[in-house]
């Protein structure tokens, strides 16, 4: 797998003419209190615990923040401070945009634009001057289904642009990645414009395949297409972070707890242009569907985790 990825990176470097941070494989924070780690410690006699410990708990994963955090600034600060103490870089996901998931399995988010601005302000203040990787609002640029009017779409773009600005101001050492959906969702032609309008010019880059299953090569091809359009229309290109947490077997066309998914390349294979990261936490449910028909979105399941380890 690593050899194949190195070959792909060699190809993509010719297409992406940006520079950026090169992260060492051990740069990123491994949270000893992640849900898989806590579950494995609390169920040490369960045969699934050893598998989860061996395959998942030692890999850096993102921590997601949303309206379930009663004090988001304090929650973010606690996570970032723990990473600082370990001399590692945390990966965070901001996930509180109004009309989140268009009312789907992960519905929720801030009540309105003002509430979101206050929330992202607090989120960014929690990071402060620490280094961090931040993925901003998964699906928010790809999922315009519930934004029926131009005004509603413009409001979404303006909120994301504000989020980038507030993160740059309050968390100047953070690498900010706007989410851009996945390789088989929104046409690159459309996504390039949305990214630009959402302030990608002021961000580090864009994120792909968050919580999805598409092979890394497909995401790289899509990133190249988007970057080509950003270059021709706006005069810049951007690095990309790709969620590889569950793309080891690629996609079968299903997005919600599909059977046959497998863990992908672990966090840390990176160049200045491409960062691979486990953004979705392996074992967390996508919703009550697929091989987890009774599991709410975001709930950790050891059975789902073991399925990803074994690829079934």
Where are these regions (language model features)?
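Bacterial N-terminal signal peptides that target proteins for export
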Residues: 1-9
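Surface-exposed substrate-engagement region within the catalytic domains
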Residues: 30-57, 183-303
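Substrate-binding cleft of extracellular glycoside hydrolase catalytic domains
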Residues: 70, 78-176, 194-195, 200-202
């Amino acid at each position: 797998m690593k050899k194949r990825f190195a070959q792909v990176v060699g190809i993509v470097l010719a297409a992406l003419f940006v520079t950026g941070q090169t992260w060492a494989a051990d740069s990123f924070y491994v949270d000893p209190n992640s849900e898989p780690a806590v579950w494995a410690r609390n169920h040490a006699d369960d045969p699934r615990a050893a598998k989860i410990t061996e395959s998942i708990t030692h890999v850096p994963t993102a921590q997601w923040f949303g309206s379930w955090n009663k004090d988001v600034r304090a929650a973010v600060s606690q996570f970032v401070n723990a990473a600082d103490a370990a001399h590692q870089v945390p990966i965070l996901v901001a996930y509180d945009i109004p009309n989140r998931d268009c009312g789907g399995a992960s519905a929720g988010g801030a009540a309105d634009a003002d509430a979101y601005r206050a929330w992202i302000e607090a989120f960014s203040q929690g990071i402060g001057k620490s280094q961090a990787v931040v993925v901003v609002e998964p699906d928010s640029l790809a999922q315009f289904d519930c934004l029926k009017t131009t005004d509603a779409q413009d409001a979404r773009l303006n909120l994301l642009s504000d989020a980038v600005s507030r993160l740059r101001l309050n968390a100047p050492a953070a690498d900010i990645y706007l989410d851009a959906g996945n390789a088989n969702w929104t046409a690159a032609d459309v996504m390039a414009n949305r990214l630009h309008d959402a302030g990608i010019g002021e961000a580090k880059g864009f994120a792909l395949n968050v919580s999805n299953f598409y092979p890394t090569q497909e995401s790289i091809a899509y990133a190249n297409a988007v970057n080509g359009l950003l270059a021709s229309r706006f005069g810049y290109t951007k690095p990309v972070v790709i969620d590889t947490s569950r793309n080891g077997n690629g996609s079968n066309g299903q997005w919600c707890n599909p059977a046959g998914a497998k863990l992908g390349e672990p966090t840390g294979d990176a160049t200045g242009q491409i960062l691979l990261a486990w953004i979705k936490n392996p074992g967390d449910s996508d919703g009550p569907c697929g091989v987890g028909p009774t599991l709410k979105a975001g709930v950790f399941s050891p059975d789902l985790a073991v399925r990803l380890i074994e690829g079934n």
